[in-house]
């Protein structure tokens, strides 16, 4: 009857799918490629080396189990793999050691920038306060002045003086809030926001982060990036900055932001 024929056709299609999976797995092994079970196991081993909080570790394991149940041929599999790769590549709780040598910092600032005595004095003051109160949230410096006076390069000198990594994003002409917060991973071609991408590139969670041309931000129908930056820069909120792609809070409180 009709039910039996439907059940039989369903079983046939499942058996065919299983047979093709096994065939593909064997071909991958013959070619010397990594089978997707090995890929999952490799990710699990890498995750064991990470200094994650319990929440992050549980979330990662849950998402990894989800990937394990997926068919490697579907588009969602590669999205899920990219998502888990991002988790493994981000520098969770990995900080570089600060160098609080104020004389050395003064020499680096003098070497790279002629004049600007008042600005350099304020920067050294900030570094002195950070040295005395190590538990203090990183200050946000805002450098204001005409083009070409060395605002952006001053951020690079501060990073060198502190022994921190240096990252910079240009905010000029940015109109979409998703540039800061990222897109939800359900969208095709979704990416994390520029903040999370830059931290991945820096390799530490406490770089000197230059936000260039902050006054050139403009809002549009896609949202207001300036409002999204408030969560990035507010010391009360940035301990748990939420990126739409990451779907987890990320601690930005140790990042030293320099706006120009």
Locations of regions flagged by a protein language model:
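Extended, charged alpha-helical coiled-coil/arm scaffolds that mediate oligomerization and mechanical coupling
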Residues: 1-133
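The Walker A (P-loop) glycine that initiates the GxxxxGKT/S ATP-binding motif of P-loop NTPases
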Residues: 143-145, 182, 213
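AAA+/P-loop NTPase substrate/partner-engagement loops
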Residues: 161-191, 198, 218
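Conserved alpha-helical scaffold flanking the Walker A/P-loop in AAA+ ATPase domains
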Residues: 186-211, 242-249
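Active-site phosphate-binding and catalytic loops of NTP-dependent enzymes
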Residues: 72-73, 92-96, 130-137, 165, ...
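Conserved catalytic/switch belt of AAA+ P-loop NTPases
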Residues: 211-256
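Walker A/P-loop
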Residues: 137-171, 200, 230, 234
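Pre-Walker A (Motif I) flank of P-loop NTPase domains
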Residues: 135-141, 205-207, 255
């Amino acid at each position: 009857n009709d039910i039996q024929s439907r059940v039989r056709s369903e079983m046939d299609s499942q058996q065919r799918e299983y047979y093709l999976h096994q065939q593909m797995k064997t071909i991958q092994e013959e070619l010397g490629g990594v089978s997707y079970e090995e890929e999952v196991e490799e990710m699990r081993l890498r995750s064991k080396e990470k200094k994650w909080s319990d929440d992050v570790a549980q979330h990662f394991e849950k998402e990894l189990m989800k990937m394990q149940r997926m068919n490697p041929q579907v588009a969602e599999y590669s999205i899920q793999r990219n998502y888990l790769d991002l988790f493994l590549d981000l520098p969770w709780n990995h900080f570089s050691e600060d160098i609080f040598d104020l004389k050395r910092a003064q020499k680096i600032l003098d070497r790279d920038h002629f004049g600007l005595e008042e600005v350099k004095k304020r920067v050294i003051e900030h570094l002195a306060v950070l040295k005395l109160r190590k538990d203090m949230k990183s200050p946000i410096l805002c450098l204001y002045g005409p083009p070409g006076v060395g605002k952006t390069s001053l951020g690079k000198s501060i990073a060198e003086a502190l022994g921190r990594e240096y990252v910079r994003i240009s905010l000029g002409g940015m109109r979409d809030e998703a540039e800061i917060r990222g897109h939800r991973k359900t969208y095709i071609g979704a990416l994390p926001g520029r903040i999370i991408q830059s931290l991945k590139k820096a390799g530490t969670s406490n770089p000197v982060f230059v936000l260039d041309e902050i006054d050139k931000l403009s809002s549009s129908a896609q949202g207001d990036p300036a409002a999204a930056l408030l969560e990035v820069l507010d010391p009360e909120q940035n301990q748990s900055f939420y990126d739409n792609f990451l779907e987890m809070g990320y601690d930005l409180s140790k990042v030293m932001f320099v706006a120009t």
